[in-house]
Amino acid sequence: MYSTLISSLIITAATMHAPSAADERAAFITTLGRDTVAFESFTRTAARVEGDIMVRIPGTVLCHYVLELASDGSVTRSTLDVKPLGAPNLASRHVVVEITGDSLSADVDSAGHREKTRRAIGKGAFPQFMTGFGDSYGLYSSLGVYEALIQHLVTGTDTVSIPSINMATGRTVPRQFLRRSPTLVDADYFKIAWTHLTLDASGQIVSADGSETTEKVQSHRTEFFDVPQAAKQFAALDKAGKGIGLASPNVIAKGALSGEAVVVTYGSPRRRSRTILGTVVPYGKVWRTGANEATVIVCDKALVLGTTTLLAGSYSLWTLPKQDGSVDLIVNAQHGQYGTDYDASHDIVHMPMKVGALEKPQENFAIAIVDGQLSISWDTFVWAVPIALK
């Protein structure tokens, strides 16, 4: 159903009239494994950049942006409208940012709640919008950010910091960029990873690889098509119960040891036809063991996990899969942090896990406490360690 709808959108795009030479018009499609999770189309003229972004997770959300340009191509005003078409728990949002010299004013209306701010900005600041499944590459490409990178970055390890303006809030933050080659540029992802961008000879983005980020998405450039019309169709699927839903739902797994409850909370990512070990979950790197916040185990009585005694309380669980097929379970004294905030100085123990294989790929990541074993399973792997009351 999804692939048929997406194919029809691309075919329609190919039959549309091309824009005049003075304009730029294109689109980006973003995928998470087998699922298409975001679309963007944009048009640029000498005085204006206008685009639409549709995000499908957890439900269809349509974002419309407009940038007004001065004669030198700099942005004087940005407008962003966020409309939740198939995500009823998300508030609508209208944001206007006025840029004058070295300052900006932002007017944010979130479901009727107004907030106005004013702040200084750095020279050359550019608007950005991150959807949760990739950046707005139409904004970056249209505004020539990457043409500027080609001019100012030498190949190798040279980086440049460009001040950016979050179109959804008006806040500013520096973004780091690293040029790997004439056609490869890395964009900083919250200072924890890089998004790898492939450019053409003119400096336009043709693809973006977010596999090293927490989003794990791939984006590629395609012909312009009608994103708002596509959003209506996907919103109808949401209402019919046929949407994608949450990317990684939070799960509370309950087990019992000699009548005492043990609880594990974790985010459960989906396989989505991807190879997990070595790609989604890299070898040789500590993994949050799930998604979203750090995975946590809680018990009101002392436990023996493997051969290690843990006092009653809460602990975060991490894993370290290795190229040779072995896996270590890491128990950490911190808990409540996000899954990217691992701090090895709080580790209590690293212990080997028993490694097994499932007969067929498992779609949902899962953690369970059954028959005296704490098991972690996904795709074709299952890792286990003994667990008991002290």
PLM segments and residue spans:
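Solvent-exposed helix/loop surface patches that form functional interfaces
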Residues: 92-184
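Short, exposed beta-strand-loop hairpins at the edges of beta-sheets
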Residues: 205-212, 373-379
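N-terminal mature ectodomain segment of secretory-pathway/periplasmic proteins
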Residues: 31-112, 176-182, 186-189, 203, ...
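Tryptophan-anchored aromatic micro-motifs
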Residues: 22-36, 40, 158-164
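Predominantly extracellular/luminal regions of secreted and cell-surface proteins
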Residues: 250-273
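Sec-dependent N-terminal signal peptides
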Residues: 4-13
